[in-house]
């Protein structure tokens, strides 16, 4: 087949060269191609950096089907395509073209594609980009032609007029020479028409493709925003044809792929330069939705709640009584004469089908107003009876025939009740009703609703009737007007008047839309055991909701229950393991899943699954996508109701080699464990040392909310209206205050479990001597005296071989602590002592890192690294110095060095644990952030919204709208406070547990397995952390186990013997008794057993009652409204500079310092634990011991000298010691001594 082109050269204004005709054009093949992850674009003008952004806009869904169109010429005669049909624009278009010869030249956008409406042309004529919006006479086959590599004809449109936009871009030269080989160019575009602007996004990729659209990820950037202001419903592509002559043009190879945008949610990842580097289509599959729900591209193993679903109705059930008679409305409306208004007449209509559409569609009625019911809904309703009241009044008096009206007619002739349910119909009958008609002009008392007074006087002979003189020549306001008032009696008895709706079959036990006598709803209908009275049509529950109905045809009573509704949970092994997921439809039968839809009534394809081997019912709901194994194993991912899931291979659970998510029943023991089967247990025979890190939060940040500023901003009108809400705001802050008090109480109670430090008595003045410069100040227990600092600042520890080198490196500079870390047997270690300067430095770094992490985008968290490192190094130091724990357990001692590696591995999780604790701290800020986002997205800027309302509406309507905003904000605040209360309860429970562990694990040695770490407890060390405590538990865990046959008791001579401590085990030939946590067999004696009862086995059944969750009673709002919505006055509040939310930061530096000191003293107080090893710690004598020691020496010397002198045994040491008179050798003691003369003896 060959394509022939004929040119029609029309000499029109603004005409191009004419148009061409294509002969024998085949229909497009329209093959489908996957879009993969292409077509993402920058949908707004906001610059974002290093952030994940959730946005809702019109995007091309990932992996959607694109339609392929060709410009193709194969063998010149047989396969020739030039596909340029008119395509649907929809909500936007994704367009991708693969080519090599510049075949694609542009597009035409419009609606009718004729000269009656404007169209937009965006084309490349090989030298310019031309953009025009006009009324075009478009060519049937718009195209460009290229002859011998040169642009020849522009056959796009013949003429144009009424142009409103005309733009020509800068000139260039397009290569129009046909090329051979593979496709070299991939150009992608996105077109969106919003608010009169056509936005164009584009990206270019160099390719080398023989065919098809490449897979991958692409991001398009904005290039044009054109203010066309036209309606765009369709578009078509403008392409070029080629020839070596001036005729017989043929297409060159090119392909383009199109798809429509859909409104969806995408999560975009921006790098630090503001570039989109990745994206997730949140509705693509369960894993994608999960990523958007947790706002993270990486998902850890577990089960996550994503969204809600509701089972959609499958059928519609309409049940009306079997009534065929037509209601006689024609007799009422077409009566020959209508009565006087004071003597109005009533007609009862029953046992008939009422076609109200004839009435409210009639154009002859001047008034058709309904109260308590919509005219368009009457066709779906049934009533016990309908009453038609008729009378004649003036046209101007029709307004008085309405609830709550006053006037001569409403007060003295015809009165409607305030709760009137019905319709008022009136029409002008000036030509038909003429003459005198009467009405009552006055009366002693006003009429009651539907009261009729036929008297003509007031009882005292005074005439009360006046006359209408109707004729067609008076003004319209005084002309005769007929009025029919239809009063509807609501169903309190069987329906007798229904709309002309055809009844359908009754469908039970399925989710359906139902209509019983006008009662509409959605639910499941089931047979009921209730009994109705003969007149009763509906049944109500304690909350006054309709929960049962009588079928008007069979008179059967039916219960109404809601259709299945619940959450959708996604089970994932973690994105690092697999992208495979399973989906749990909570509390729903699998038979309902194919019709399950999301709460917003959308039906993504992934929601609908076909039944098969990977669909099975559990008590938790319908699980889809996981293979069910009929066995019990240790739980990996708990799903609920005793069902667990794992990501396993064939060697573990399955019969094939492929990994898959496997669901199974939860077991108490490990897989194939003999410890829980066949009367056998596993008893440890060997152990290894392990260290477990445990983080226990005990408090959280305190917050308060400035309710008025947060809800109303600077709007005085809103603030005044907020006063009518009573004590809502006060109660919110009262709850937050209670949370803050609870946090202080938690902290106090946790630290109260720690033993108080030993305090020395206050000794400042003793025996008249002032010791204030020598003895420490008892009011400052952490400060040493000058002499203490000078003489006694060292502690002697057992050196495993690294402490001396550390001390030589450290010198007197505490800041070199980490730098001086030593290597010991391949491990980095530090001495297990911290000076006060070191404690202060590390604590400050930790607190600063945690506090600044929130506003430094995580960079501040780097300050926490030294804290984690020194903690790990010091515990390495503790480990290597404890070279002998048990001399009678040589194997444990020998394996200690290998266990140090495990300790290091365990301590590597400390940073992660602290990160979790940081999450506890930041959850409050996150809740506030969520609250702000919720209010921002739902209500916009507070002040601008309120001011806009006040400017557009009158006072009453404005207060109604502001009231809605206040209600929404109060609800958000209430949600936030509820989250805080829940979190506070969790923190309280954690604080209680931390206090217990402080007592049992730190101050003692717990006998509970896995309570203080994983395994059997040896010792624990607390470390302070923001808003919590970090415990490092040293435990020994079984490294080898052996299975033994066991029995709970031994029956001997009709009596049952039970072990006092431990269990009975058998080695195959004999029975022994051994400890449960370590195999140490002993002979069974009366010392380790006791006798109780006989050998009979008594089986008891515990209470297994399962209580249904309580249904809250929905009481009337009246009491609540009476309590809060009341007249309330208050002086104006000066808000000043009070911020909207006061998210205060609690400074617990003193508590952290205190915890450091307490932890140190606790470690020193574990005297009983020193018996476990050979670790020795020598403390130098205090200064007062040294003083006493020196004083004693001095006293001994003085006493010795005195004795020597008194006993004349002084040797004088050749004159070095002069003893005075005690060394004289004069025998005459009576010789006088001359004053001033010194005597010498020889």
UniProtKB/Swiss-Prot annotation:
One Pfam family, please name it. Answer: bCoV_S1_RBD
Q: Which UniProt keywords apply?
A: Coiled coil, Disulfide bond, Fusion of virus membrane with host endosomal membrane, Fusion of virus membrane with host membrane, Glycoprotein, Host cell membrane, Host membrane, Host-virus interaction, Lipoprotein, Membrane, Palmitate, Signal, Transmembrane, Transmembrane helix, Viral attachment to host cell, Viral envelope protein, Viral penetration into host cytoplasm, Virion, Virulence, Virus entry into host cell
Q: Where is this site: Cleavage?
A: 654-655, 784-785
State the GO CC annotations.
host cell endoplasmic reticulum-Golgi intermediate compartment membrane; host cell plasma membrane; membrane; viral envelope; virion membrane
Topology in the lipid bilayer is annotated as: Single-pass type I membrane protein
Name its GO BP terms in alphabetical order: endocytosis involved in viral entry into host cell; fusion of virus membrane with host endosome membrane; fusion of virus membrane with host plasma membrane; receptor-mediated virion attachment to host cell
State the superkingdom. Answer: Viruses
Q: Where is this region: Fusion peptide 1?
A: 785-806
Q: Which residues are glycosylated?
A: 65, 115, 124-125, 162, 231, 273, 322, 334, 361, 576, 589, 630, 678, 686, 770, 1043, 1067, 1103, 1127, 1142, 1163
Coiled-coil parts of chain? 918-962, 1144-1172
Where does this one sit in the cell?
Virion membrane; Host endoplasmic reticulum-Golgi intermediate compartment membrane; Host cell membrane
- Which residue ranges traverse the bilayer? 1183-1203
Which residues belong to any copy of the BetaCoV S1-CTD domain?
325-500
Subunit-structure text: Homotrimer; each monomer consists of a S1 and a S2 subunit. The resulting peplomers protrude from the virus surface as spikes.
Q: Tell me which family the UniProt entry assigns to this protein.
A: Belongs to the betacoronaviruses spike protein family.
This protein is called Spike glycoprotein
What organism is this sequence from?
Bat coronavirus HKU3 (BtCoV)
């Amino acid at each position: 087949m060959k394509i022939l082109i004929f040119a029609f050269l029309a000499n029109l204004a603004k005409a191009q060269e004419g148009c061409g005709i294509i002969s024998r054009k085949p229909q497009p093949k329209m093959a489908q191609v996957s879009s993969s992850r292409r077509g993402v674009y920058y949908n707004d003008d906001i610059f974002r950096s290093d952030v994940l952004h959730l946005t809702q806009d019109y995007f091309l869904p990932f992996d959607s089907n694109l339609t392929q169109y060709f410009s193709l010429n194969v063998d010149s005669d047989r396969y020739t395509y030039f596909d340029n049909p008119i395509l649907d624009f929809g909500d936007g278009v994704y367009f991708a073209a693969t080519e090599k010869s510049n075949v694609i030249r542009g597009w035409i956008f419009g609606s009718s594609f004729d000269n009656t409406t404007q169209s937009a042309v965006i084309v490349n004529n090989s030298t310019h980009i031309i953009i025009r919006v006009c009324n075009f006479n478009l060519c049937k086959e718009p195209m460009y032609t290229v002859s011998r590599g040169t642009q020849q004809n522009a056959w796009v449109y013949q003429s144009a007029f009424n142009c409103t936009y005309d733009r020509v871009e800068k000139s260039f030269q397009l290569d129009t020479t046909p090329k051979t080989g593979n496709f070299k160019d991939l150009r992608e575009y996105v077109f969106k028409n919003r608010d009169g602007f056509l936005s164009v996004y584009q990206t270019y990729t160099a390719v080398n493709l023989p065919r098809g659209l490449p897979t991958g990820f692409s991001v398009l950037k904005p290039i044009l925003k054109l203010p066309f202001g036209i309606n765009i419903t369709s578009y078509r592509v403008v392409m070029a044809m080629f020839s070596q002559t001036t005729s017989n043009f043929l297409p060159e190879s090119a392909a383009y792929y199109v798809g429509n945008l859909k409104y969806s949610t995408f999560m975009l990842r921006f790098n630090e330069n503001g570039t989109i580097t990745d994206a997730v289509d949140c509705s693509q599959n369960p894993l994608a939705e999960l990523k958007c729900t947790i706002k993270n591209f990486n998902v850890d193993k577990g089960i996550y709640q994503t969204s809600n679903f509701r089972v959609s109705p499958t059928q519609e059930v309409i049940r009306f009584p079997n009534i065929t008679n037509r209601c006689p409305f024609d007799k009422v409306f077409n009566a020959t004469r209508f009565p006087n208004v004071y003597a109005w007449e009533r007609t009862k209509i029953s046992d008939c089908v009422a076609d109200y559409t004839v009435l409210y569609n009639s154009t002859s009625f001047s008034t058709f107003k309904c109260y308590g019911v919509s005219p368009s809904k009457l066709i779906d309703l049934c009533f016990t009876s309908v009453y038609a009241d008729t009378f004649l009044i003036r046209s101007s008096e029709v307004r008085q025939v309405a609830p709550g009206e006053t006037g001569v007619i409403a007060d003295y002739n015809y009165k409607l009740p305030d709760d009137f349910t019905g319709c008022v119909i009136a029409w002008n009958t000036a030509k038909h009703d003429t003459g005198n008609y009467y009405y009552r002009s006055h009366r002693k008392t006003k009429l009651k609703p539907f009261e009729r007074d036929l008297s003509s006087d007031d009882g005292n002979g005074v005439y009360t009737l006046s006359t209408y003189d109707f004729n067609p020549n008076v003004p319209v306001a005084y002309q005769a007007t007929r009025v029919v008032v239809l009063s509807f009696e609501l169903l309190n008895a069987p329906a007798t008047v229904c709309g002309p709706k055809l009844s359908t079959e009754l469908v039970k036990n399925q989710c359906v839309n139902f209509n019983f006598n006008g009662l509409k709803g959605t639910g499941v209908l089931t047979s009921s055991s209730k009994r109705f009275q003969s007149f009763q049509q509906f049944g109500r529950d304690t909350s006054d909701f309709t929960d049962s109905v009588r079928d008007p045809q069979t008179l059967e009573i039916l219960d109404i229950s809601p259709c299945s509704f619940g959450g959708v949970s996604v089970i994932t092994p973690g994105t690092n393991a697999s992208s495979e997921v399973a989906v749990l439809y909570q509390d729903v039968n699998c038979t309902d899943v194919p019709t399950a839809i999301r709460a917003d009534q959308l039906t993504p394809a992934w929601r609908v699954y076909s039944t098969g081997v990977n669909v099975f019912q559990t008590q938790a709901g319908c699980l889809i996508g996981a293979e069910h194994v009929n066995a019990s194993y240790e739980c990996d991912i708990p799903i609920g109701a005793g069902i667990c899931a794992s990501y396993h291979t064939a060697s573990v659970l399955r019969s094939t080699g492929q990994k898959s998510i496997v669901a199974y029943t939860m077991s108490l023991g490990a897989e194939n464990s003999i410890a829980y089967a066949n009367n056998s247990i596993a008893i440890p025979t060997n152990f290894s040392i392990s260290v477990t890190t445990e983080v226990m939060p005990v408090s959280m940040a305190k917050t308060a909310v400035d309710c008025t500023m947060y809800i109303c901003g600077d709007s005085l009108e809103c603030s005044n209206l907020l006063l009518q809400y009573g004590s809502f705001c006060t109660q919110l802050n009262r709850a937050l205050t209670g949370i803050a008090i609870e946090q202080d109480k938690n902290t106090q109670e946790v630290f109260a479990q720690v033993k108080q430090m030993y305090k020395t008595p206050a000794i400042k003045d003793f025996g008249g001597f002032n010791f204030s410069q020598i003895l420490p100040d008892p009011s400052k227990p952490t400060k040493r005296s000058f002499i203490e600092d000078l003489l006694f600042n060292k502690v002697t520890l057992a050196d495993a071989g690294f402490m001396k080198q550390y001390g030589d490196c450290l010198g007197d500079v505490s800041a070199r602590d980490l730098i001086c870390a030593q290597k010991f047997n391949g491990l980095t270690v530090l001495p297990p002592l911290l000076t006060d300067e070191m404690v202060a430095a590390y604590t400050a770094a930790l607190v600063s890192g945690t506090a600044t992490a929130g506003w430094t985008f995580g960079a501040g968290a780097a300050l926490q690294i030294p804290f984690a490192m020194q903690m790990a190094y010091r515990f390495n130091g503790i480990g290597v110095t404890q070279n002998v724990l048990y001399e009678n357990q040589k194997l444990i001692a020998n394996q200690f060095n290998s266990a140090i590696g495990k300790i290091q591995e365990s301590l590597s999780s400390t940073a992660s644990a602290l990160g979790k604790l940081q999450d506890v701290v930041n959850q409050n800020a996150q809740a506030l952030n969520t609250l702000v986002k919720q209010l921002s997205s739902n209500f916009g800027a507070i002040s601008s919204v309120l001011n806009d309302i006040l400017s557009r509406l009158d006072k009453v309507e404005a207060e109604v709208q502001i009231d809605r905003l206040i209600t929404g904000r109060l609800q958000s605040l209430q949600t936030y406070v509820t989250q805080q209360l829940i979190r506070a309860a969790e923190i309280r429970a954690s604080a209680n547990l931390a206090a217990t562990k402080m007592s049992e694990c730190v101050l003692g040695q717990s006998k509970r397995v896995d309570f203080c770490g994983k395994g059997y407890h040896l010792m624990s060390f607390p470390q302070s952390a923001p808003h919590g405590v970090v415990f490092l538990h040293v435990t020994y865990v079984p490294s080898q186990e052996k299975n033994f046959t066991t029995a709970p008791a031994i029956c001997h001579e009709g009596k049952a013997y039970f072990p006092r401590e431990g269990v009975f085990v058998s080695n195959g030939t004999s029975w022994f008794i051994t400890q449960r946590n370590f195999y140490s067999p002993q002979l069974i004696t009366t010392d380790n057993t006791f006798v109780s009862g006989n050998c009979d086995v008594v089986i008891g059944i515990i209470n297994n009652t399962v209580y249904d969750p309580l249904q809250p009673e929905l009481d009337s709002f009246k009491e609540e409204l009476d309590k809060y919505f009341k007249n309330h006055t208050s002086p104006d509040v000066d808000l000043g500079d009070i911020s909207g939310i006061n998210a205060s930061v609690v400074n617990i530096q003193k508590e952290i310092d205190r915890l450091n000191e307490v932890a140190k003293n606790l470690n020193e107080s574990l005297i009983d634990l020193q018996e476990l090893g050979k670790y020795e710690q020598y403390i130098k004598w205090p200064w007062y011991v040294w003083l006493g020691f020196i004083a004693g020496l001095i006293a001994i010397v003085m006493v010795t000298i005195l004795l020597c002198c008194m006993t004349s045994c002084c040797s004088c040491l050749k004159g070095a010691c002069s003893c005075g008179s005690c060394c004289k050798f004069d025998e005459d003691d009576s010789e006088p001594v001359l004053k001033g003369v010194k005597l010498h003896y020889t």
